[in-house]
Amino acid sequence: MTVAKIENSGARSSFNRRMLFRAAGLAALAGLAACATVLPTGEGAGVSASAVGTLAGIRASAGLGPLLPDPQLEQAALQQSGYMARGGRMTHTTGWGKGFASRVKGNGISGAAAENIAEGRFDQQKLFDIWMHSAGHRRNMLDPRFTRFGLAYVRHGRDSSLRYWSLVLGR
């Protein structure tokens, strides 16, 4: 009887440890899931065609040629805007080490590229005004290496006046 109790006690102890480890694992996963809350997104659009004139004027003022709208760059911009809207924050990464370079490459884009992002309750004209008054964003738009661009936005799912903007530039 004592042997049976010891064996039974050991099995119960082993069973309890397994249950404890499983519970701890589930608690950790629940914590991670809470950190990765995904917000609903609203309407989104690639709007490169509507920005051709604005970008041409910006570049002409610096003696540069116009940029052409590009569907691959627009897709990369829309992808980033959607990611930002779902996360509810501005970022150049898409999580877990997926930065701008890997996203651009994943969209079939090679060569030099740059990205401007923004979050706010403003229209396209105000967006470019903000970027032109920021040294880094201005430098990207006036980089003579770039000949193509893609512009997109996605609205925040709970606040339709809040837009997440992305401009991707490339050669």
Task: Pin down the residues of each PLM region.
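Surface-exposed patches in mature extracellular/periplasmic domains of secreted proteins
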Residues: 62-75, 88-96, 114, 138-144, ...
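A generic secondary-structure micro-motif detector
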Residues: 44-45, 70, 90, 127
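Disulfide-stabilized extracellular recognition modules
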Residues: 2, 6-7, 122-171
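N-terminal secretory signal peptides
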Residues: 1-15, 19, 23-34
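Bacterial Sec signal peptide processing site at the extreme N-terminus
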Residues: 32-55
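Solvent-exposed, polar/charged alpha-helical surfaces in well-ordered, non-transmembrane soluble domains
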Residues: 49, 53-57, 75-82, 102, ...
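Short, surface-exposed glycine/acidic/tryptophan-bearing loops
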Residues: 74-122
